[in-house]
Swiss-Prot record:
GO terms for cellular component: cytoplasm; nucleus. This is Metallothionein-2. The lineage of its organism: Eukaryota, Metazoa, Chordata, Craniata, Vertebrata. A divalent metal cation 7 binds at residues 50, 57, 59-60. One of its GO terms (molecular function) is zinc ion binding. A divalent metal cation 5 binds at residues 34, 36-37, 50. It comes from Bos taurus.
Length: 61
């Protein structure tokens, strides 16, 4: 399986729990697709942009 879970936007796919989903656009992806977001970030969404090596990203800074 592609570790990036890349697929057409809105298309269903099966992202594994360990998947980092760097470029995931899957509507079915239940987890955040931003590896640097802190756990439990309510605002975290697919397509957020990581800011450097910190634990902050564009959607839950």
């Amino acid at each position: 399986m592609d570790p990036n879970c890349s697929c057409t936007a809105g298309e269903s796919c099966t992202c594994a729990g360990s998947c980092k989903c760097k470029d995931c656009k899957c509507a079915s992806c239940k987890k955040s697709c931003c590896s640097c977001c802190p756990v439990g970030c309510a605002k975290c969404a697919q397509g957020c942009v990581c800011k450097g090596a910190s634990d902050k990203c564009s959607c839950c800074a």
